[in-house]
A protein has these predicted regions:
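N-terminal subdomain of nucleotide-sugar transferases
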Residues: 1-39, 215-218
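Nucleotide-activated donor-binding/catalytic signature segment of Leloir-type glycosyltransferases, i.e.
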Residues: 237-257
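Aromatic "clamp/platform" in nucleotide-sugar-dependent glycosyltransferases that forms part
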Residues: 278
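Short hydrophobic beta-strand element within catalytic cores of glycosyltransferases
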Residues: 294-298
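A charged, aromatic-enriched C-terminal amphipathic alpha-helix characteristic of glycosyltransferases
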Residues: 318, 332-365
Length: 365
């Protein structure tokens, strides 16, 4: 997925390794993420190249493959493999890159070629419940030699679907937190008067439930500033309506309008963070909140139990009453600085850039 910051952050870890990367687009976007563009034009030990004409065929072939079960991109990927003879094909994400790899290699996988697939977010946890996707996932996982995921949960799910190969160490797919990230000044918990809400609503995101909980808690939350970030249009509209009705100070940021650093700086002054989703792998926002001292309120579908216990709040049902209770509990947890300190130590020990990179560098051995 050439437009993905997650792809770019994964690849940047290998910039000083003697590896030749040939990038094949799996998403319909002609845009290449700026971070990835820098790799393509860089001069480190690793080389990063796009498959010839990749910027031009990504969209039209994706459209055709919607009706042809990935025939066109699968055929093209097969030709690319025959021409360039890679030692590893690594599918970063399953429903696009993985399924295209399946079409290219099913019944025609060279014995010398290693197929590695990486589960992103909801790739298995959500899609396994749909029969057509489950069948494809089973075929792909039985073909794969190696599998990586962000959650131990998803390793178990892959095994249940027939994967018998090498399970790589569980790490965040997008890399870890740098020294510069950890150097961002953190506001003292007692001085924090901001609540951060992830603003995505649609497919699996449920930001509107968060906002409805805020509406019903308006009296309790007077004095707090609510920041709704990464919000789609309908969420921006609802936030404005609730602010007008309740008098709460609600600041909004549309999807893609905040940089990574700005998001971290927001969490560095937030008392709690609320993120609701029907399905996810690791929630990157949850990790960012934990790194910056904001107590997380996260749906249990995001493997949050693998990252915090009593220093955060897991939401087990996405209803307004449940979210209201979770917000109240998180605000109480935020009163004890030890909870934020515990979360920060978890991030430093499991998600620092140095540690994640050290593990990632073993993937292509």
């Amino acid at each position: 997925m050439l437009d993905s910051i997650h792809s770019a952050r994964w690849l940047v870890q290998f910039g000083e390794q003697d590896i030749d990367f040939l990038l094949f687009p799996s998403s319909p976007h002609r845009r290449v993420h700026p971070e990835l563009e820098r790799l393509l034009s860089g001069s480190g030990a690793a080389t990063f190249r796009l498959v010839p004409l990749a910027r031009y065929f990504a969209l039209p072939l994706w459209v055709l493959d919607k009706f042809a079960n990935n025939f066109f991109r699968g055929s093209l990927l097969r030709q690319v493999i025959r021409k360039f003879k890679p030692s590893i094909v690594h599918a970063l994400e399953l429903q696009n890159a993985g399924y295209v790899s399946l079409r290219a290699l099913s019944n025609q996988k060279p014995k010398s070629l290693k197929l590695m697939v990486t589960n992103w977010g909801s790739d298995i946890f959500w899609f396994q419940r749909f029969p057509k996707h489950k069948a494809k996932l089973q075929q792909l996982l039985q073909l794969a030699d190696a599998y990586s995921a962000e959650c131990e949960r998803d390793v178990v799910l892959a095994r249940n679907l027939g994967f018998t190969g090498q399970a790589m160490p569980v790490i965040p797919n997008a890399g870890g937190f740098s020294e510069a990230d950890f150097a961002i000044p953190l506001l003292d918990p007692s001085e924090r008067k901001t609540i951060a809400l992830k603003g995505y609503h649609g497919w699996v995101g449920k930001a509107k439930v968060s906002l409805e909980a805020v509406r019903e808690m308006a009296e309790e939350l007077q004095g707090y500033k609510i920041i709704v970030y990464s919000a789609n249009r309908s969420v921006l509209k609802l936030a404005k309506q609730i602010s007008k009705q309740t008098g709460l100070e609600i600041e909004t940021f549309g999807k893609g309008t905040m940089s990574h650093k700005q998001v971290l700086e927001m969490f560095a002054k937030s008392k709690i963070y609320v993120g609701l989703s029907e399905s996810d792998g690791i929630s990157t926002s949850m990790l960012e909140a934990m790194a910056m001292g904001a107590i997380p309120v996260q749906t249990s579908t995001a493997c949050c139990d693998e990252w915090f216990g009593d220093s955060g709040v897991a939401v087990h049902e996405i209803t307004v009453p449940a979210v209201k209770n979770a917000i109240r509990e998180a605000l109480k947890l935020a009163e004890d600085p030890a909870n934020a300190e515990k979360n920060l130590e978890t991030i430093k020990s499991r998600a620092s850039a140095e540690m994640v990179k050290k593990i990632a560098l073993t993937f292509y051995d």
